[in-house]
């Protein structure tokens, strides 16, 4: 699978592919939030999309990493991005998009340990969904990630 992503189907430049993947990831994350919280925010579309795209790049950086490793790395990336976005959106701009202050093991109310576990689950789904989208939309190789 590694190395087979380049130029699989002509017509999509790297920027176009990235924007499509960010858009798909952002839309899916907003849908997850709407199902879970009943509301979302425009900043979550951007954050969810960028996190989805970054998780998709794990195959490029760690081509032989098992799914569990990709899930852990994806969760770590999401937590970092969520913390930085929270500092800007919630603390600096005071938009109040989310507040984990009441959750155990939180950091400034922007991230918390219980949600980090859920991010690992979502990251696992994102790893597989990214490969499926790349296969369906761009004709790239598809193989399920190995578990161990």
What would you call each of these model-derived segments?
Residues 3-148:
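Aromatic-rich, lipid-facing transmembrane alpha helices and their immediate juxtamembrane interface loops
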